[in-house]
Amino acid sequence: MYKRQVVEGLTAKYNQLRDASFTLHKGEILGVAGLDGSGRTELLETLFGYRTRQSGTIKKFNFGFRAAQGGTPEDYSMEVHDINGTQVGEEISNLSPNSAIKQGFALVTEERRATGIFGILDIRANTVIANLKNYKLGKFPLLSDAKMARDTDRMIEAMHIKTPSQRQQIKNLSGGNQQKVIFGRWMLTNPDVLLLDDPTRGIDVGAKYEIYELIQSLAKQGKSIIMVSSEMPELLGTCNRILVMSAGQIAGEYVPTGDGKVDQEKILELAAKNL
């Protein structure tokens, strides 16, 4: 079933994010570029409900019934309307991180050590912490230790996490392995949309390429990804489209041409548009 997300007029209450509108398709990697302080992180955090939204909407659309009539969703216009001309779509509240998770969103934060991991807890706790409801034993306030152990082992294997034990404190892992634990945590929630804020920041080259491969694999599985990055080559090499932010607003959208020099110049022009 083909899906897409449409964000319209998203404005945050306590930061500079203003009137952000864009479309995100199923299986797409959408980049977000911009200078420091341009509102990139604020965009992701507002989408996730971590920051207070003042106005704007997030809607889910489903194109399955259109594709069934012949052709693919791309063959049709970008908007679907009912017989009265009103746009059809399921509005998503995302007024808190908890509601965003229930709606299929996941956020990998920029500051891994400060807001991503729980340093004194072990790998198992860090892996299952966003999905604890699935480990409850009936009506009792107890968790299934065996199920948590199985899921953690599965994520360690799937993410190629290097650790002597799932009981190892996560603070003792390398930055790359810590980041892979965070990705594994969110995979257990089976998200539709992944919000990635500088996901390869502060990790070694080998781990970076593993993260790139993981992102591409998730997109092929139909996950929709919004990725902020401070590294232009990373965005150009990974993303289908790139939103460029300037002074809290989306200044434009760019589709990489394959000419790195030209692409970077065009993106920098947009990044300075509202300064």
Q: Which residues does each PLM region occupy?
A:
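Glycine-rich phosphate-binding loops of nucleotide-dependent enzymes
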Residues: 3-275
